């Protein structure tokens, strides 16, 4: 059996159409008042308020519940419809509805809508004539019932009374909106000017930082150039010292084996890396001192064998 949910879909469509109508009414009102707005913000705010009212008041659940009951009846399930009929015919339900009506009346009265205005609104409705400035006043069923019950009288001694109605002072409303707009404009300008000042300060700090970085980079480049020059000078000096020592070594009256040994130690000096060169010089000096020490010990032993003594003056 085909399951029908057309009533639920129609109720959901009516609720969605009501929301869209609320959005259109809100945006058109803002446009007529000359107020600039963000459509997405208006849409979000109206949707939030609409959903809250529909859910909190129970209107949405009530409509959807009745639609589900109708669909169930159309599908041959009359249990829910019978329960609703019994509920509507119950005296407690009638008392609850009367209580709700009385609450609504008191709420309208507290909002300044008195009994006279409520009765007139319930007895008459106004139909606008397309293309004309005039309107047609229509009597409702309540007015017809009052005529049949003789509850309508004609006052021949009618004295025009000023009806108390809520009027809107559009000039005052415009002045208020203009003040709010000017206040908002002033706050926006203040925030914009503050942002501009902060942006300028950030830009100045950035430029200053870039200048400092450029100066530091230039100083680093100078130090690098000085370091390279110093390294080249040290390499040149080390090479010159090694050459000078080799020349001096060749002029000495030493044996060829000693000269070859010292030259090998000099050739092992790293002339490209000054740090390694200093370590190599230290090693050469240690070896020379060690050789001198052994030579002195041998000389001292030879003197002792010859019955000579060695003194330092």
Swiss-Prot record:
The keyword Coiled coil applies. The keyword RNA-binding applies. Keywords: Coiled coil, Host cytoplasm, Host-virus interaction, RNA-binding, Translation regulation. It is found in: Host cytoplasm. Residues 150-206 are annotated as: Dimerization. Residues 166-237 form a coiled coil. One of its GO terms (molecular function) is RNA binding. It comes from the Viruses. InterPro entries: NSP3_N_rotavirus, NSP3_sf, Rotavirus_NSP3. Residues 208-313 are annotated as: Interaction with host EIF4G1. Homodimer. Interacts (via the coiled-coil region) with host ZC3H7B (via LD motif). Interacts with host EIF4G1. This is Non-structural protein 3.
